[in-house]
């Protein structure tokens, strides 16, 4: 396994797919990185030379990846919660943030149903 940006990427897959194992890199970004490094997308990771791996690492140095990116997103969410914005309140309450309906769905965000017992008449 080749180690790029602190992540072991699979050797038997194509380079484009392997790079997506790094948090913060999708398929489009992987294609752009390989184009800038001058490496074919169809190459397998096991066939890459050390020079090519170093070119990829140099390209990825300009991106915010893995721990830094995770930290930035969590700090952004924390900031929203501290300033008391609508989005921050939704995060704090564990509800959908982007305006989705919560009357029937949103079970992923709300967790399992908490049934309330009926009053006897």
Curated annotation (Swiss-Prot):
InterPro entries (UniProt xref): Rbsml_uS13_C (IPR027437), Ribosomal_uS13 (IPR001892), Ribosomal_uS13-like_H2TH (IPR010979), Ribosomal_uS13_bac-type (IPR019980), Ribosomal_uS13_CS (IPR018269)
Classification via Gene3D superfamilies: 1.10.8.50, 30s ribosomal protein s13, domain 2
Gene Ontology CC terms: cytosol; small ribosomal subunit
Biased composition (Basic residues): 106-121
Residue ranges, annotated region (Disordered): 91-121
Pfam families to which the protein is assigned, alphabetical: Ribosomal_S13
UniProt keyword rRNA-binding, yes or no: yes
Domain of life: Bacteria
GO biological process: translation
Keyword Repeat: no
Keyword list, A-Z: Ribonucleoprotein, Ribosomal protein, RNA-binding, rRNA-binding, tRNA-binding
GO molecular function: rRNA binding; structural constituent of ribosome; tRNA binding
HAMAP family given in the database record: Ribosomal_uS13
Binding partners and assembly: Part of the 30S ribosomal subunit. Forms a loose heterodimer with protein S19. Forms two bridges to the 50S subunit in the 70S ribosome.
Similarity comment text for this entry: Belongs to the universal ribosomal protein uS13 family.
Function as written in the Swiss-Prot or TrEMBL entry: Located at the top of the head of the 30S subunit, it contacts several helices of the 16S rRNA. In the 70S ribosome it contacts the 23S rRNA (bridge B1a) and protein L5 of the 50S subunit (bridge B1b), connecting the 2 subunits; these bridges are implicated in subunit movement. Contacts the tRNAs in the A and P-sites.
Protein name: Small ribosomal subunit protein uS13
Organism: Lysinibacillus sphaericus (strain C3-41)
Top-level taxonomy: Bacteria, Bacillati, Bacillota, Bacilli, Bacillales
């Amino acid at each position: 396994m080749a180690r790029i940006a602190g992540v072991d990427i699979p050797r038997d897959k194509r380079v484009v797919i392997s790079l997506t194992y790094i948090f913060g890199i999708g398929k489009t970004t992987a294609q752009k990185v390989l184009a800038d490094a001058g490496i074919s997308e169809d190459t397998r990771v096991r066939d890459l030379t050390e020079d090519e791996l170093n070119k990829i690492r140099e390209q990825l140095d300009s991106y915010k990846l893995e721990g830094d990116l995770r930290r930035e997103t969590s700090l952004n969410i924390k900031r929203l919660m501290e300033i008391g914005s609508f989005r921050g309140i939704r995060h704090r309450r564990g509800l959908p943030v982007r305006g989705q309906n919560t009357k029937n769905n949103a079970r992923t965000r709300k967790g399992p149903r908490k049934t309330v017992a009926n009053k006897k008449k």
